[in-house]
From Swiss-Prot:
Location in or out of the cell: Plastid, Chloroplast thylakoid membrane
Alphabetical list of SUPFAM superfamilies matching this protein: PetG subunit of the cytochrome b6f complex
Transmembrane segments: 5-25
Protein name stated in the entry: Cytochrome b6-f complex subunit 5
Gene designation: petG
Entry function: Component of the cytochrome b6-f complex, which mediates electron transfer between photosystem II (PSII) and photosystem I (PSI), cyclic electron flow around PSI, and state transitions. PetG is required for either the stability or assembly of the cytochrome b6-f complex.
Gene Ontology molecular function terms on file: electron transporter, transferring electrons within cytochrome b6/f complex of photosystem II activity
NCBIfam families: PRK00665.1
Family listed: Belongs to the PetG family.
Pfam families in alphabetical order: PetG
Length: 37
């Protein structure tokens, strides 16, 4: 009965990883925008 725990961990990690990728992409976009200025 490890599947419920594993699925819970995966469902908990997916939004965190998506948020991390979104934040890093946003920071890189802002940095590139500042460099273009």
């Amino acid at each position: 009965m490890v599947e419920p725990l594993l699925s819970g961990i995966v469902l908990g990690l997916i939004p965190i990883t998506l948020a991390g990728l979104f934040v890093t992409a946003y920071l890189q976009y802002r940095r590139g925008d500042q460099l273009n200025l």
